[in-house]
Regions:
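N-terminal glycine-rich FAD/FM-binding segment characteristic of electron-transfer flavoproteins
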Residues: 1-319
């Protein structure tokens, strides 16, 4: 039986959806499952980790781990992997995961694969699938090492309701501080917006929104739907949206239930960040915009006319 260690994705004391998705997949392939949680004051998350399907919970809870630092976090994951005897170590697709995974792979002499969208396990043979060249090709990779460290794309696996694990907590000691880098402060998004990675609905704006008035109008729609609010790279480059809202190859990778692209033409770099969405709705006044080639539903029209109608229809449905 394979042993899968999932690295819990925790942001400001909140367990991210990707953790449950990875644990569900581990259960689905019949693996023995464990999770490692790292941070400060995180023991309250243990029941949620059990409910998500973990059978063993490695917990590194220490004031020294309050601020993310790739070196110490990697040391905690390596220690948990050794104690558990993990064959597979899975990270969610986050900046932290992408920073820690290569360090863990190096220390464990394991293979490391990034942006995984599918994984199969037959006997001792592990095979992963990942996009490459801005999603123009799909790579099928056979792993020839005993261990694999993988960073899994958002939405690649579904969280399954009704599964559960068992509580078996193993406490880990905090490693020595990283002498090469000292984290002084982490600055979080102060907008209060829903995290793009966890949002069931994401609405993004592109150059077609033109100016702040267009952005504000679409933001009101996002508020109506309690949706995450993102943008294309063009809006970031123009200084109209912050980089942490950028969806695309060089920004956030999202896979919500519904993705609404407003005023976005559909550059390949943007599509690479949202083509895992379950349903895509595009709004653009250009009927030839490439975004319509990937959209499930399309509305050709000016956003200043379309968005108010959408908001009004939403109000009618909720009335």
């Amino acid at each position: 039986m394979a042993k899968v260690l999932v690295v819990a994705d925790i942001n400001q004391g909140v367990l991210k959806r990707s953790t449950a998705e990875l644990l569900s997949k581990a259960k689905a392939i019949g693996a023995e499952t464990a999770v490692v949680a790292i941070g400060r004051n995180i023991e309250s998350l243990i029941p949620g980790l059990v409910d998500a399907g973990s059978d063993t919970q490695y917990v590194a809870d220490d004031p020294a781990l309050e601020l993310f630092s790739a070196g110490p976090y990697a040391s905690c994951v390596v220690e948990a992997a050794k104690q558990f005897g993990a064959d597979l170590i899975w990270f969610g697709f986050s900046e932290g995961g992408k920073a820690v995974a290569p360090r863990v792979a190096t220390q464990l002499d394991a293979a490391c694969a990034n942006e995984i969208t599918a994984l199969t396990l037959e006997g001792d043979q592990i095979e992963v699938i990942r996009p490459a060249i801005t999603n123009k090709v799909i790579q099928r990779v056979k792993v020839n090492t005993d261990r694999l460290v993988a960073v899994i794309r958002a939405g690649a696996f579904e969280a399954t309701e009704g599964i559960t694990g068992s509580e078996n907590v193993v406490k880990l000691s905090a490693p020595e501080p990283d002498s090469k880098a000292v984290i002084k402060e982490l600055v979080s998004d102060a907008s209060g917006d829903i995290d793009l990675a966890d949002a069931d609905i994401v609405i993004s704006v592109g150059r077609g929104t033109k100016d702040q008035a267009g952005i504000d109008l679409v933001k009101e729609l996002a508020n109506d739907l309690k949706a995450g609010f993102g943008s294309s790279r063009a809006m970031v480059d123009a200084g109209l949206m912050p980089h942490n809202k950028q969806v695309g190859q060089t920004g956030k990778i999202v896979a919500p239930t519904l993705y609404i692209a407003i005023g976005i033409s559909g550059a390949i770099q943007h599509l690479a960040g949202m083509n895992g969405s379950k349903v895509i709705l595009a709004v653009n006044k250009d009927p030839e915009a490439p975004i319509f080639n990937v959209a499930d539903y399309g509305i050709v029209g000016d956003l200043f006319e379309v968005v108010p109608v959408l908001r009004e229809e939403i109000k009618k449905i909720r009335a």
